[in-house]
From Swiss-Prot:
UniProt GO BP: cell population proliferation; insulin-like growth factor receptor signaling pathway; negative regulation of apoptotic process; positive regulation of cell population proliferation; positive regulation of phosphatidylinositol 3-kinase/protein kinase B signal transduction
Annotated S-S bridges: 50-92, 62-105, 91-96
Start and end residues of each stretch annotated as D: 107-114
Ranges where the record places region A: 86-106
Protein location: Secreted
UniProt lineage: Eukaryota, Metazoa, Chordata, Craniata, Vertebrata
Organism field: Cyprinus carpio
Official protein name in the record: Insulin-like growth factor 1, adult form
Keywords: Disulfide bond, Growth factor, Secreted, Signal
Disulfide bond listed as a keyword: yes
Matching Pfam families: Insulin
Propeptide intervals in chain numbering: 115-161
Functional note: The insulin-like growth factors, isolated from plasma, are structurally and functionally related to insulin but have a much higher growth-promoting activity. Acts as a ligand for IGF1R. Binds to the alpha subunit of IGF1R, leading to the activation of the intrinsic tyrosine kinase activity which autophosphorylates tyrosine residues in the beta subunit thus initiatiating a cascade of down-stream signaling events leading to activation of the PI3K-AKT/PKB and the Ras-MAPK pathways. Binds to integrins.
GO cellular component, one term: extracellular space
Family according to the record: Belongs to the insulin family.
Length: 161
């Protein structure tokens, strides 16, 4: 055996040993990290909803019905909670489920669907188009300014009292 072949074989053995040791070190580090993080993950549990996040979630869950921050009296089972607890107490300070969020939605009015409510909003007060006064349809800018000044209008804004 030549000395070159001996050194080449020796370096291969050293390289293999080093790779095994690095591999073991990385594996051990990974296992320790997983073990260290596991108890925190188990204790965390579901997330809570507070502030704008709670409002956005309620709007999504309740839709057009709307929602209450405190439950109306006689709405849902009240034996488990005190009278002054609301959605913030139940879903911000502790986690809550979808069923709990739905309890704070306003009840659906019988016979009205969200679509009919939307349509009704647009048809409740029909607006009549303004009719131009005969003979004054082509007023000059100066005439319009004089009319507005005589009415006490400032800055082109219309104020109603």
């Amino acid at each position: 055996m030549s000395s070159g072949h001996f050194f080449q074989g020796h370096w291969c053995d050293v390289f293999k040993c080093t790779m095994r040791c690095l591999s073991c070190t990385h594996t051990l580090s990974l296992v320790l990290c997983v073990l260290a993080l596991t108890p925190a993950t188990l204790e965390a549990g579901p997330e809570t909803l507070c502030g704008a996040e709670l409002v956005d979630t309620l709007q999504f869950v309740c839709g057009d019905r709307g929602f209450y921050f405190s439950k109306p009296t006689g709405y849902g089972p009240s034996s488990r909670r005190s009278h002054n607890r609301g959605i913030v107490d139940e879903c911000c300070f502790q986690s809550c489920e979808l069923r709990r969020l739905e309890m704070y939605c306003a009840p659906v009015k019988p016979g009205k669907t969200p679509r009919s409510l939307r349509a009704q909003r647009h048809t409740d007060s029909p607006r009549t188009p303004k009719k131009p006064i005969s003979g004054h349809s082509h007023s000059s800018c100066k005439e319009v300014h004089q009319k507005n000044s005589s009415r006490g209008n400032t800055g082109g804004r219309n104020y109603r009292m």
